[in-house]
């Protein structure tokens, strides 16, 4: 890595000074933060052209994305650099700034909202500024795919931080200026235009980028928040003393009123299905690239595998209760499923999950091996006790767990002990 200063940095600072500035940032005023950002020194990849300011800006943006994303000073640095480039461009009548400039600028403005989540007025201001910037970029670069990605990200973050975060169980849809499901539909429509534009250009490189994949993760996070909204044990201290009780509590949630802003999303499978359909399409688009990232492909396959496992949980539970639990003797159906129906559905879903988990396997990451073994064990549990199908799955899972346990010095001994008689 080569350390270079950007236009926003007038002189290089020693590492110790940089750390002190970052430490002081947390208590600095906005003006002080702006001043401090002018002292920022960042390590950028060696391939970044030191004479190309847009290339440097992209490197700074990438540095933030690859970090813990918890440094407001760095975000302010990106914004100050964008401001400087914009002023220079206006005063010197240079060539128009490229679309990627507007995308980075807009994302940085929206990112500031994450450091001020308790100040709703500020959050709104940041998103207004971010969306104005992305629209300004789209006026100059209609249908630019990077700007469409940026717009989708910003809209999803806005839904989470500006619209969902302030809600309580007593919230009413009448209190909002827009319905959240309509906002979500609008954001996803922009993402669909990303897919359509890539297809039109026959260029799928936009999907070989974790920043684009972040969109699907952001949607998944929103759906998770909605799904768990109102859980009775939210805010537990996390003690292990009553784990079994806590697990039961986690399943109990408060029913949302039909007038609640999240009611429509929580009581619909529409968005979960959208997530899966477009994650499949994401994988298809990745596979169209000759040199697509293997790491990204594994990540997408892992997410798909986990989604099928999650979907299998209800029928799996129904099958095991009706098959083995004495409390359910004489009961023919649970959750609208018979024992045989639940067994068949579970087997199909876990088989699909296994297919994707195998594609997600990383020889350098034993955790991915164990995910495969655990899915095999779950699938084995759905067959008759001591059947050939069950024995074959258990044996294969045992081999995988032993290998993972050996290379990790016993990390997965508990999983092995649970499997072995």
Swiss-Prot record:
This is Enhancer of translation termination 1. The keyword Transcription regulation applies. It comes from Candida albicans (strain SC5314 / ATCC MYA-2876). GO terms for biological process: positive regulation of SREBP signaling pathway; regulation of translation. Required for correct translation termination and probably involved in regulation of hypoxic gene expression. It holds the Pfam family Nro1. One of its GO terms (cellular component) is nucleus. PANTHER family: ENHANCER OF TRANSLATION TERMINATION 1. Residues 1-43, 230-259 are annotated as: Disordered. Belongs to the ETT1 family. The keyword RNA-binding does not apply. Residues 235-252 have a biased composition (Acidic residues). It is found in: Nucleus. Keywords: Nucleus, Transcription, Transcription regulation, Translation regulation.
